[in-house]
Structure formats: C-alpha cells, structure tokens
Amino acid sequence: MTYLPVALTIAGTDPSGGAGIMADLKSFQARDVYGMAVVTSLVAQNTRGVQLIEHVSPQMLKAQLESVFSDIPPQAVKTGMLATTEIMEIIQPYLKRLDCPYVLDPVMVATSGDTLIDTSARTYLKTNLLPLATIITPNLPEAEEIVGFSIHDPEDMQRAGRLILKEFGPQSVVIKGGHLEGGAKDFLFTKEDQFVWESPRIQTCHTHGTGCTFAAVITAELAKGKTLYQAVDKAKAFITKAIQDAPQLGHGSGPVNHTSFKD
C-alpha cells in the first residue's frame, strides 16, 4: 500500500496555470504530495494581468470545505487568495480546528499589480488569521501592509519580522526580499531563531505565481513532517530553479517551471 502525505490549498484560480490553486497543485505534485483544493474565487487572469474576479457563493465555499475535511484530512493546509472578510469568516473556524501545520500566504496584489483583496479583509486577516498560522510568507509589499512601515533594506526586514511575531502571533514568518535591490535575501523568523538565505538575483520578467509556488512547497514539505527550516530551505531551492528554467510563456510576466527542480 502506497502512502502519500496530503496537502490542501484554499485559494483562487488561474486559468493560465501560473498562480493560485493551479500553481499549488503543480507544486504539491512535484514534491510527491497528494494535493486537494478548495476554490475561494474564480479569477480570469493571465501573464498580462487580472481581467475579472468572481467569488464563489458562501454555500459553495462551505460545501467544499465540508467535502474535504469530512473525508480526507490533510497533513498541512495553505491559504492563498482570501479576497473578502466573508470568505475569511467562513474559513476561520476550520483553521482553528486544525491539528496540522497551516501556511498563510497573505495574497494581496497579483504580480501584475492588480489588487486581490478588499481593504476591510486586510484587517481581518491580520487580527484573526495570522495568529492561527504556523508560518506566513509575505513578500515585501505584503509585509509592509502588515507592519505599517516601509521596508528598504535587510535591517527593515528583520525589524518587520520581529514585529509580526510579537504583534500578530504567528509561530513563524518568512519575508521574501525579492523586491529589494541587490541579491535575493529571504529571512525566516521563529520565536527562538532567525535564518537567512541569499542567492544572486535572476534577471527575468517570468515571476508569475512565485509567491504561490514558494508557499505551496513549504506546505508540501510540512505535510511530510519536515521542520520549518527544512521546508523553507527546500522551497527556496525549488523556486530559484523554477525561475531559472521558466518556460518563456505568455506576453507578460510569465510563469515559472514547476517541473525543473530535482532533489
């Protein structure tokens, strides 16, 4: 009998396949994890931007959650695009009952710059979901939104990481420094430790779905029972290779390659 760890993503769609639950499921598969998905929003988007968003009904969202949790318990859960307070209020009770790692990707803006979350929902996210998370995975703009100040350098990143842990209560936070000048430096902050990864910047426009993919790999590794450090370390290596080997698709910010990384 073959055993596969199980990971669940709760997020929006991307018909072009580069981001959202499509990227998450590809990442789970690439890391030998059985993937499940609950759709929060139907998003018409591609490498050029977001064209239209329609949220699933509250009834459909609840039904999907019940379908999953009543039948196949996950070993790790990831949330991505949670666009409204209502969506978060429906999901939150399920997150509170989790007995497995919860990875919160605070998706607020698409790679194209399009806004993906209501203003009121940002407050709910910070006060009601962040305290439930095993790890949150903001990029610099998302971290700035959470902490309320600008981040210009690694020192600001460290200040932001410590503030997020203290004020909002997640168990850990990894802040991605891809938006800073210079090398790509990412920081992982836990209650006890601080770790940093640094790699040369890859000059490319093909970064669609990088945040989703990074968080999904962390989720997959945690579903396998890996430590936070091991999960983030693997995600960093995975996304670096995925960007390096991007398939040059689309007319805008193209997707990464979810198949290129091999252990």
For the regions a language model picked out, list residue spans one by one.
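Short, small-residue alpha-helix embedded
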Residues: 22, 145, 204-228
